[in-house]
């Protein structure tokens, strides 16, 4: 007899666990706040290390399929200074041990490997409490609840399960990251595409930096990093349709005055 497992969160961790349990004949149900697998973008490239992530995929029986998703050339690395001068370069020779893959593609692989109905979409957890004797109750935003003999929290930074084990809460660490995308970069943004190369780019300075990854289809996915007080970024909501994104972009770009144009274009020419 096995105890059904309840997993909160259909991210990579929760789905990998559900798949490994399925391989071993242990039923699990995954509850996810998002309405569907395509409710939002799923982030950029992930490097899956040989000593942990790939081991989990082997246990899940999905390693061969994972290899088919690998972005060839994605382990290449370029480091530039603020003037665009190459400081360090490491090509992808095909012998690396941390291949890059799109997070969304890996998530879909995991979803497709699970029995229909394993993931319950649109179930946002509002509370979790112990019932004693190893059982727990999970309450959802729609007022419904489930009880379970084994509860796993895989629901990220703002986990509703973690408080059962720890009083720790996320705290502002002193830096913010702003994401941008450039599409069809080789044709439309050739200077930036050349700067990034075939894999990852790092252009860092004290208190700030520009990091970018090349994704399949000529997409450049950039993270602009700034250190500073939380108040600097509070009140800016780039997802709000009423936000003047041009003004916000200009405000952030001002912090990179004097940087090489092929680097700042990763921010100022961003299409999202």
Where are these regions (language model features)?
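Beta1/beta-strand and adjacent pyrophosphate-binding region of the FAD-binding site
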Residues: 1-13
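Conserved N-terminal helical subregion
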Residues: 2-5, 20-22, 47-185, 229-239, ...
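A structural signal for isolated positions on well-ordered beta-strands in alpha/beta enzyme cores
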Residues: 6, 29, 221-223
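Glycine-rich FAD pyrophosphate-binding loop
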Residues: 8, 22-42
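Short phosphate-binding/catalytic loops that engage adenosine nucleotides
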Residues: 26, 62, 261
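Short beta-strand micro-motifs enriched in acidic
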Residues: 130-133, 213-217
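FAD/FMN-dependent oxidoreductases across multiple families
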Residues: 194, 198, 205-208, 214-216, ...
């Amino acid at each position: 007899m096995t105890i059904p497992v309840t997993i909160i969160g259909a991210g990579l961790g929760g789905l990998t666990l559900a798949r490994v349990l399925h391989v071993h004949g242990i039923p699990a149900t995954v509850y996810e706040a998002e309405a569907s697998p395509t409710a939002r973008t799923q982030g950029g490239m992930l490097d899956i290390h040989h000593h942990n992530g790939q081991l989990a995929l082997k246990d899940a029986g999905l390693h061969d399929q994972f290899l088919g998703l690998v972005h060839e050339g994605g382990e290449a690395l370029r480091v530039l200074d603020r003037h665009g001068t190459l400081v360090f370069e490491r090509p992808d020779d095909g012998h690396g041990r941390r291949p890059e893959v799109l997070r969304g593609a890996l998530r879909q692989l995991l979803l497709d490997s699970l029995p229909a109905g394993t993931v319950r979409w649109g179930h946002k957890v509002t509370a979790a409490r112990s019932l004693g004797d190893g059982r727990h109750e999970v309450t959802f935003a729609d007022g419904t609840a489930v009880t379970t003999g084994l509860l796993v929290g895989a629901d990220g930074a703002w986990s509703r399960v973690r408080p059962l084990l720890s009083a720790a809460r996320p705290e502002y660490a002193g830096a913010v990251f702003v994401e941008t995308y450039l599409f069809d970069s080789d044709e439309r943004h050739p200077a930036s595409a050349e700067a990034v190369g075939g894999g990852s780019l790092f252009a860092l300075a004290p208190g700030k930096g520009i990091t970018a990854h090349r994704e399949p289809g000529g997409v450049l996915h950039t993270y602009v990093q700034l250190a500073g007080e939380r108040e600097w970024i509070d009140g800016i909501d780039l997802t709000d349709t009423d936000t003047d994104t041009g003004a916000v972009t200009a405000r952030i770009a001002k912090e990179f005055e004097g940087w090489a144009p092929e680097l700042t274009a990763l921010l100022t020419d961003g299409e999202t």
